[in-house]
Amino acid sequence: MNTTPFHSDPPPSRIQRKLVVEVVEARNILPKDGQGSSSAYVVVDFDAQKKRTSTKFRDLNPIWNEMLDFAVSDPKNMDYDELDIEVYNDKRFGNGGGRKNHFLGRVKIYGSQFSRRGEEGLVYFPLEKKSVFSWIRGEIGLKIYYYDEAADEDTAGGGGGQQQQQQQQQFHPPQQEADEQQHQQQFHPPPQQMMNIPPEKPNVVVVEEGRVFESAQSQRYTETHQQPPVVIVEESPPQHVMQGPNDNHPHRNDNHPQRPPSPPPPPSAGEVHYYPPEVRKMQVGRPPGGDRIRVTKRPPNGDYSPRVINSKTGGGETTMEKKTHHPYNLVEPMQYLFVRIVKARGLPPNESAYVKVRTSNHFVRSKPAVNRPGESVDSPEWNQVFALGHNRSDSAVTGATLEISAWDASSESFLGGVCFDLSEVPVRDPPDSPLAPQWYRLEGSGADQNSGRISGDIQLSVWIGTQVDEAFPEAWSSDAPHVAHTRSKVYQSPKLWYLRVTVLEAQDLHIAPNLPPLTAPEIRVKAQLGFQSARTRRGSMNNHSGSFHWHEDMIFVAGEPLEDCLVLMVEDRTTKEATLLGHAMIPVSSIEQRIDERFVPSKWHTLEGEGGGGGGGGGPGGGGGGGPYCGRISLRLCLEGGYHVLEEAAHVCSDFRPTAKQLWKPPIGILELGILGARGLLPMKAKNGGKGSTDAYCVAKYGKKWVRTRTITDSFDPRWHEQYTWQVYDPCTVLTVGVFDNWRMFSDASDDRPDTRIGKIRIRVSTLESNKVYTNSYPLLVLLPSGMKKMGEIEVAVRFACPSLLPDVCAAYGQPLLPRMHYIRPLGVAQQDALRGAATKMVAAWLARAEPPLGPEVVRYMLDADSHAWSMRKSKANWYRIVGVLAWAVGLAKWLDNIRRWRNPVTTVLVHILYLVLVWYPDLVVPTAFLYVVMIGVWYYRFRPKIPAGMDIRLSQAETVDPDELDEEFDTIPSSRRPEVIRARYDRLRILAVRVQTILGDFAAQGERIQALVSWRDPRATKLFIAICLVITIVLYAVPAKMVAVALGFYYLRHPMFRDTMPTASLNFFRRLPSLSDRLI
């Protein structure tokens, strides 16, 4: 065993960190004093230190502007500390009837949200409830920041306890000071005294997957006292992947004196490793030193498994030393040089001026200027922003400049320019206010100035910022013609409604009189809304009045702004040729909206003949069109706002809210997504003489919000570092992120080439722990006709920020998944599939009209529009999923078979004892069963998934797929393959259908045998069964039930020496019962 001597503790640090909480104001707090007001004060609790502000007398919008400072005992673990801020109403300033200070709200902030001094800003936090039944409103404005200051050794070592004691004295009443001091001396001795305390026994610290199970006292103890030796058992990843010593251990103490032998070098940013490499540390009393045992363990799917990456972005679980860039703390800040060019004035005569922007690394030109009507050409306007990549080293270079010059597009003559020193360009970081544009005098060479060719001013602003800047989404990164298709963009899906059309009755129809005898006219109503159409069944005729009745519902999908018209056509289909009897056009915007099941009155609409423009409500004379009167039709129309219009597959749906906003419930949290970048993308196109290239961008979809990152051109390892947020209304939803190759940026308006899919991932929100950052790398997998192919990897950081209390989140699990109308008036499965296809087309058409457009192929891929297509591979995957679900039953049957065969006599005897206890005390059966489930859940906690799972190729049966099955999966409908190929596939499908047919027949036969027990199809078998049942009845009446249960159980568990290898008499009796199989033709 190799041993390594321990090192002595490092000297105490002379740097002390302070946390400052500036309580600014509160707004719209709840009145609690019984007189319509509140006298509020704030209590701040951090690291066992409490402080309070002054009380503001009777003010619902109090302003404090008070600063409270706290000592940070462990700066390295500050990100995991909690800052509790509570607002109370002071009972002393009330009406005298209160016994305690009333609670007005609370805010809980984690240390990862603290900012360094100089980067803080005023942030308003909504006040939260303490319990489900609390009534809280309002918000509180805070400034929170920290700073480090120098402190002497006494202050750093022993001043913490004294300062904490003083803070406790400041908050608590004087009568509690003595008790507090005694309590602190008892449980928090100074460090000088702690060094003399002998250890009672070695502590046991288990570090598992980034979680530390250790008391706070033991953590403080390890900082000042030498620990026993450490034996480390580590499961490391494969050799080609490195893991640093501090990965996935956010709570690990960096000052720990023990060091394992030969530690690997620390990982660099962006390094990846398989999750989870498990490290367990057990402290034992052995000689100094430690052993390391490495066990290589590969993930189940190899290179197709998601991995944890170590990033500089920080956020929680991958690194300890991180900087918070609130609220964009999931991605790395990328600096850009922003140049906003607004307009110019007093320019020399020109036709179409433009601006050139030049640095040492970039050269771009603006679009041609726009001159307002009525203004001279010497005052052009551009209103354009450029975002050029910038590094700190660019500003540090001596003489680095930014040149902005104006030029005449027709003659390419120089109109003047401005030069900036990059070292003097200001740095802007939101929430700083935007820099106001300023006028700069255009300059040129000395000859140009003397000749008068250079004149005028240009209005612009220059600053250095990051991708957080509000000007970044609309900024131009280059002057290429296709730059509009490379910008980032946020889209919103259209608001979709279900349009319910109830066709009731039609009167005064002009039916042809020359019908054959005894022939009833076949009258149908066809409804059409855009590309959607539906037709009713044959109407029933009333012989007395000559009217036709249907009472049939048709449902369509209508999208805002509701500009379409609903067209109703009454057709006579008695003959082969359909005859139009009349039509009516109804604007969708005029249809009544409802959000519940209330009754909507019907209206009569006039039917018009050829040339009519529309039908209005009323009687025969109430039409407003220009065509002849052809009858009238009674309709009940309404826009259903109580349904959720499904445009996604139900199993990957990201939103279940109804259309009507009045029915929305408050959000339960915020989903934050940081799209870091991609690695190892494959070439998707060839340009510049056959050189492979990829122009990748990402699309993320959750709820009604779509986001699109900017396109990184000609890069196989693009880095986006863009962060987006969504409000979460239901945790049982799915976030979808896709990667595409941009083809539209190279095509003109006449040649619209679709973008190529690279891959996508799905993350279910319910699998994320609250307020925890997951920074992972997921493989991008695409199923091609040649098989499964890995197109690269995407790196994302995701966090489900859940500020609400736990009951608010858990209450969502007990609520219905879909809105109320889906259960009161449910829609059929086939009808939902048709409506989903229509909704997908409408969303795709809506997003295709945006700039830059989101292509229909992108929308269909993100919405899984082809998820219901036939595939032999999917059928096999679903079959094995069923087998996996029933595996527990198979395992239980095998376990019982091993028990009854006495494979393990000790276990069988224990089962006998447990069976006796349960039979004699039947009240313990149900509690024992639930206790067993609890134990199973606790046991499987060790094997819980540590990161959100990605696409599983083994579950999808995509590892080894038959080429012909893949070709069949990608075949169109109707098929485009040769007849002999289709015939071979049909024969193969028939063979599979025979197996299914046989299994269904066997199931039916077993059920029919059960029915034959009392159906007298076999008289002798029925007589025997009735006689056996009579004997069992007499025995159960005469013998106690417990005795019968014990006898049956012991008979079932009897030793194999008392068994017969032949089937039992009861099984033979059941197999001899007749079924209906012999009656099949």
UniProtKB/Swiss-Prot annotation:
CDD domains in alphabetical order: C2A_MCTP_PRT_plant, C2B_MCTP_PRT_plant, C2C_MCTP_PRT_plant, C2D_MCTP_PRT_plant
Primary location recorded for the protein, binned into one broad class: membrane
Transferase as UniProt keyword: no
Membrane among keywords: yes
Membrane topology: Multi-pass membrane protein
Binding site for Ca(2+) 1: E351, S352, D408
Protein name from the UniProt record: Protein QUIRKY
Taxonomic lineage: Eukaryota, Viridiplantae, Streptophyta, Embryophyta, Tracheophyta
